[in-house]
């Protein structure tokens, strides 16, 4: 537990959480199949999101951080202003991310919104879930990044 404590120095993690993490690590073989599924799903989602025109940041976790790029950004930004009106002094990148976030939220799909973050403008963080959940998110994003954003 001392080794874990040293690596987490800048972040506060209580002793109980560290003890649970240590026990999970000791029994990592119990979670191997689940971890393999998450990794497979993450890689599949990365591929599908890139095909839609989204930039994906490298990830070794159970989530992907992504944002529209290129021509897709302009289309989504225009769709945002058309649907929601003028958004003030927001960049196209922010508008594109905001559009995706709001449209997903309308369908009760929750993602982490980083559209106003100074370094991750227009980005969303998508958690890798169960295969059916992932398929639903991908399907919805394909519609949003495709014909709906024209």
Question: Predicted regions: what is each one?
Answer:
Residues 20, 65-66, 120-121:
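Short secondary-structure capping/turn micro-motifs that flank functional sites
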Residues 38-43, 48-107, 124, 128-132:
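Conserved PLP-binding catalytic core of the aspartate aminotransferase-like
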Residues 141:
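Hydrophobic "lid"/C-terminal helical patch
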Residues 1, 22, 131-138:
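Short, amphipathic alpha-helical "lid/cap" segments that border enzyme active or binding sites
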Residues 107-111, 144-149:
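A common structural junction motif
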Residues 60, 116-117:
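Conserved Class I S-adenosyl-L-methionine
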Residues 1-50, 54-57:
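PLP-dependent aminotransferase class I/II
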């Amino acid at each position: 537990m001392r080794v874990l404590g040293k690596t987490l120095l800048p972040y506060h993690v209580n002793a109980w959480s560290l003890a649970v993490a240590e026990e999970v690590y000791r029994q990592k073989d119990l979670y191997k199949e689940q971890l393999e599924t998450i990794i497979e799903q993450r890689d599949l989602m990365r591929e599908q999101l890139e095909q839609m025109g989204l930039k994906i940041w490298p990830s070794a976790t159970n989530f992907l951080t992504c944002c529209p790029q290129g021509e897709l950004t302009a289309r989504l930004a225009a769709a945002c202003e058309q649907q929601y009106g003028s958004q003030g002094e927001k960049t196209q990148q922010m508008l594109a991310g905001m559009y995706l976030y709001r449209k997903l939220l309308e369908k009760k799909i929750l993602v982490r919104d980083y559209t106003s973050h100074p370094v991750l403008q227009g980005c969303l963080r998508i958690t890798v879930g169960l295969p059916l959940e992932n398929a639903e998110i991908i399907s919805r994003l394909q519609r949003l990044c495709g014909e709906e954003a024209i």
